[in-house]
Amino acid sequence: MPYKLKKEKEPPKVAKCTAKPSSSGKDGGGENTEEAQPQPQPQPQPQAQSQPPSSNKRPSNSTPPPTQLSKIKYSGGPQIVKKERRQSSSRFNLSKNRELQKLPALKDSPTQEREELFIQKLRQCCVLFDFVSDPLSDLKFKEVKRAGLNEMVEYITHSRDVVTEAIYPEAVTMFSVNLFRTLPPSSNPTGAEFDPEEDEPTLEAAWPHLQLVYEFFLRFLESPDFQPNIAKKYIDQKFVLALLDLFDSEDPRERDFLKTILHRIYGKFLGLRAYIRRQINHIFYRFIYETEHHNGIAELLEILGSIINGFALPLKEEHKMFLIRVLLPLHKVKSLSVYHPQLAYCVVQFLEKESSLTEPVIVGLLKFWPKTHSPKEVMFLNELEEILDVIEPSEFSKVMEPLFRQLAKCVSSPHFQVAERALYYWNNEYIMSLISDNAARVLPIMFPALYRNSKSHWNKTIHGLIYNALKLFMEMNQKLFDDCTQQYKAEKQKGRFRMKEREEMWQKIEELARLNPQYPMFRAPPPLPPVYSMETETPTAEDIQLLKRTVETEAVQMLKDIKKEKVLLRRKSELPQDVYTIKALEAHKRAEEFLTASQEAL
């Protein structure tokens, strides 16, 4: 049988170090120097949009799925344009003297004067302008600053030996003055809670300047002349903490730059690694247990996905605790859909590195399993299948009973997408090989749910998928299938007998009550109409034979091009869209693409 083929299990690979060691001191613990630069990340295969589960194991050095810039999903109807609104923005301390003098071009100045001119331009770009209350003010000087930033970006990209020791404090100061600021309050602080799946983000009004500042600093970090030994005097813990605070920005373009910059710093400054991980943990703890609101969780998880990929084996206790105490509780937050692909990637990376963590992870997922949120339940099923794709048979035997009890509940779900997603597990060859090896324990758990729903589920598609699962079980072990059928029949008969005994007992109690002289005084009102059970009748022998014939004739052979249902994004109404926001997000160029294009131009 095709599902009998075992998946080739490879030992987890440790990502190679691509960061050049610096003398800034190693982060203790014998951990690999994780890659300093996130590789250009291809568009991922979304979890809920993949082919029917296959047995191909994901390579352990794959990149984490990138965060989507725009989460707005359009329906087929006409787009409703939103009226302009006053744009919120960060709280900048505007410079008093905003009159800038245009300085000579760097390329036209004598070589010996370029360093001093470069410093003058960096200081000139520390002047902050008003983009909110009076966007049309100081247009001439805003253009001078924009042109200066643009020129410095080109200069540091295409020139060599320009990042001298005197440039480091000036570049870090310019970045800090422009970027480290008080973020605006929530878009709608007094009204309904901000919904990241529906509400459009507030874009930063000062982005024309901020974007160039980010681009300059990223090129500064990427420059071949950059020396972490010198930079560590200025890029310290205080700088990193201020950088992490910016991840709560609503503007996804800003978070995209921050993600790349923080990852570069993590790779180049070994002495800051433990501090960065600790501060990210604190952000997650506040998010889980206090605020349940933070805009940058997906980006932080994306960074951690690359970091986890580079952890040395065996894993340190600190890293295991991070998985159990931080990553697993992140599953219970209401806004899980915003960052779930990145979270699932991190979890699977841990299990690929150390299979002994599988049991606590699956037990934790079952603990946080959603009870009333069906789209979230589909996400859990997606992640659980990814975990089963890399699970060791010895670990599977430890968790299969609680795992399949939960799957039986999912198969019985009235929400057809939950039931459908659970039944797709039976098209995964590796999962079927695990089930085949443990059929005596799995089939008795699953059979009642499959049989009951093959007759009672309201959705016809589910019937076909159930028949397919039953057929696979029948082919796997005919005798065990017959035993489960007879056991199910016997259990139903016992249940019916117990129900009859209970009814007879109540009738006796009622008869005794009627003998009481005071019975007319306390007689209950007329009884309610009888409650009819939705359960099917006890299966007869004819039912059993009919089940076998039906399974043989109606089992659906899953086609390879059937796609899983996408994780639902709640679209409560056709909301008006802000055209400016949509165009701005579409025009944004990701930091990885930006760096790749500049390297090709060299």
Curated annotation (Swiss-Prot):
Isoform Delta-2 is widely expressed. Isoform Delta-1 is highly expressed in brain. A motif (SH3-binding) lies at residues 523-530. GO terms for molecular function: protein phosphatase activator activity; protein phosphatase regulator activity. Keywords: Cytoplasm, Disease variant, Intellectual disability, Nucleus, Phosphoprotein, Repeat. It holds the Pfam family B56. Sequence repeats lie at residues 37-38, 39-40, 41-42, 43-44, 45-46, 47-48, 49-50, 51-52. Residues 1-96 are annotated as: Disordered. A motif (Nuclear localization signal) lies at residues 548-565. Induction: By retinoic acid; in neuroblastoma cell lines. The modification Phosphoserine is found at S88, S89, S90, S573, S598. Residues 46-55 have a biased composition (Low complexity). Residues 1-13 have a biased composition (Basic and acidic residues). Gene3D superfamilies: Leucine-rich Repeat Variant. PP2A consists of a common heterodimeric core enzyme, composed of a 36 kDa catalytic subunit (subunit C) and a 65 kDa constant regulatory subunit (PR65 or subunit A), that associates with a variety of regulatory subunits. Proteins that associate with the core dimer include three families of regulatory subunits B (the R2/B/PR55/B55, R3/B''/PR72/PR130/PR59 and R5/B'/B56 families), the 48 kDa variable regulatory subunit, viral proteins, and cell signaling molecules. Interacts with the PP2A A subunit PPP2R1A. Interacts with SGO1. Interacts with ADCY8. Belongs to the phosphatase 2A regulatory subunit B56 family. The B regulatory subunit might modulate substrate selectivity and catalytic activity, and might also direct the localization of the catalytic enzyme to a particular subcellular compartment. It is linked to Houge-Janssens syndrome 1: An autosomal dominant disorder characterized by global developmental delay, hypotonia, variably impaired intellectual development, poor speech, and dysmorphic facial features. Additional more variable features may include macrocephaly and seizures. This is Serine/threonine-protein phosphatase 2A 56 kDa regulatory subunit delta isoform.
